[in-house]
Regions:
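Negatively charged, low-complexity tracts enriched in Asp/Glu with abundant Ser/Thr
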Residues: 1-20
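A short, structured beta-strand/loop element
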Residues: 26-56
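Solvent-exposed, flexible loop/coil residues
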Residues: 19, 47, 62
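Intrinsic-disorder/low-complexity coil detector
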Residues: 7-8, 52, 60
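A generic structural micro-environment signature
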Residues: 21, 33-35, 66-68
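Enzymes that process phosphate groups on RNA ends and nucleotide/triphosphate substrates
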Residues: 16-30
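Mixed-charge, Lys/Arg-enriched low-complexity segments
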Residues: 56-101
Length: 101
């Protein structure tokens, strides 16, 4: 029986590579039993130096609601990160006084 993480990808993008741990994380879109899935999955390098999917990851049916919710979440996270960077850059001294003293 083929597992969902073994189905051939329709789209694949490397989104993280940890060379020291021989790990990669890929964003993929694949079809399994006639359903398209969006997956974020960790891959490991086997003894033959081939990249293999691990069981660590998540797969969601690729539909409008899941895509929109994922996009909304990423936009919110990126906005918070951007705001955090701006606050740290412009108010670092004040924040250090508040939180480190």
């Amino acid at each position: 029986m083929i597992e969902i993480h073994e189905a051939p990808p329709v789209f694949e993008k490397l989104i993280h590579h940890n060379e020291a741990k021989h790990e990669r994380v890929y964003l993929t879109i694949n079809t399994f039993r006639d359903v398209e899935y969006l997956s974020i999955r960790k891959y490991y390098q086997d003894f033959d130096e081939e990249w293999k999917p691990s069981r660590e990851g998540v797969s969601l049916p690729l539909d409008f609601d899941n895509s929109r919710n994922l996009f909304d979440g990423l936009v919110e996270i990126l906005s918070l990160t951007e705001v955090k960077d701006i606050l740290e850059n412009h108010f670092k001294d004040k924040l250090d006084q508040i939180y480190l003293e």
